């Protein structure tokens, strides 16, 4: 398993797919990186030479925000929204959907397991 910026990527998968195992790199960015470094997109990750891995590491560290830095940036953005009392920040704080989805039904992922409320007595 080749190790790129501290992450083990799958050796048997094609390079385009293997790079997507790094947080912050999707299929489009993976293709862009491969084109920029002039690597063979059909090659397997195990076929990378030490020199190519070094070029890949240096490019990702210098030009892209990925892995821990990206996770920290996202968390700091959420904390900033909460601290300035923005609507989106309040939705994050209350663990509710942030982007305007309905909450009367659905949104169970954000709200968590159902909490039973006693029925109204007649």
Curated annotation (Swiss-Prot):
GO terms for biological process: translation. Residues 93-122 are annotated as: Disordered. One of its GO terms (molecular function) is structural constituent of ribosome. Keywords: Ribonucleoprotein, Ribosomal protein, RNA-binding, rRNA-binding, tRNA-binding. InterPro entries: Rbsml_uS13_C, Ribosomal_uS13, Ribosomal_uS13-like_H2TH, Ribosomal_uS13_bac-type, Ribosomal_uS13_CS. Residues 101-122 have a biased composition (Basic residues). One of its GO terms (cellular component) is small ribosomal subunit. Pfam families: Ribosomal_S13 (PF00416). It comes from the Bacteria. Belongs to the universal ribosomal protein uS13 family. Part of the 30S ribosomal subunit. Forms a loose heterodimer with protein S19. Forms two bridges to the 50S subunit in the 70S ribosome. Located at the top of the head of the 30S subunit, it contacts several helices of the 16S rRNA. In the 70S ribosome it contacts the 23S rRNA (bridge B1a) and protein L5 of the 50S subunit (bridge B1b), connecting the 2 subunits; these bridges are implicated in subunit movement. Contacts the tRNAs in the A and P-sites. This is Small ribosomal subunit protein uS13. It comes from Chlamydia abortus (strain DSM 27085 / S26/3) (Chlamydophila abortus).
């Amino acid at each position: 398993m080749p190790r790129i910026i501290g992450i083990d990527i799958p050796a048997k998968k094609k390079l385009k797919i293997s790079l997507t195992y790094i947080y912050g790199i999707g299929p489009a960015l993976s293709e862009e990186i491969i084109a920029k470094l002039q690597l063979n997109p059909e090659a397997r990750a195990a076929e990378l030479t030490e020199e190519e891995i070094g070029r890949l590491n240096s490019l990702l560290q210098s030009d892209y925000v990925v892995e821990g830095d990206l996770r920290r940036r996202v968390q700091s953005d959420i904390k900033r929204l909460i601290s300035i009392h923005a609507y989106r920040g309040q939705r994050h704080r209350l663990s509710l959907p942030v982007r305007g989805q309905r909450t009367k039904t659905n949104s169970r992922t954000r709200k968590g397991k159902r909490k039973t409320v006693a029925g109204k007595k007649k």
